[in-house]
């Protein structure tokens, strides 16, 4: 699985509203790691009650893929190395 970049816009299964990805590999309060953190699209971040943790397999449709460059690719590569250590 390749993680989508921040800024990507997706629709989750059985959801009415699109989400924009604002974070990747985020932990919830119990320490469980999710692939993405998202906020409503097109509104953006409203408050902490309107952000959503979800996994790649929850995505039904990808409307837009966010910006990708060498900086992001190096970040993802380093992140993958750290995850393999655990």
Locations of the language-model features?
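Short, well-ordered loop/turn sites that connect or cap secondary structure elements
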Residues: 3-4, 13
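Short beta-strand-centered aromatic/proline hotspots
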Residues: 17-27
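Short, surface-exposed secondary-structure edge patches
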Residues: 1-3, 26
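Intrinsically disordered, low-complexity, charged/polar segments
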Residues: 39-86
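Short, solvent-exposed secondary-structure boundary/capping segments
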Residues: 28-36
């Amino acid at each position: 699985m390749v993680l989508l970049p921040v800024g990507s816009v997706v629709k989750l299964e059985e959801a009415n509203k699109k989400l924009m990805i604002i974070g990747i590999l985020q932990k919830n309060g119990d320490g469980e790691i999710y692939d993405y953190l998202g906020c409503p699209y097109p509104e953006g971040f409203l408050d902490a009650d309107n952000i959503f943790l979800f996994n790649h397999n929850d995505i039904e449709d990808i409307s837009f893929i966010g910006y990708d460059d060498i900086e992001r690719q190096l970040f993802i590569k380093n992140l993958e190395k750290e995850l393999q250590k655990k």
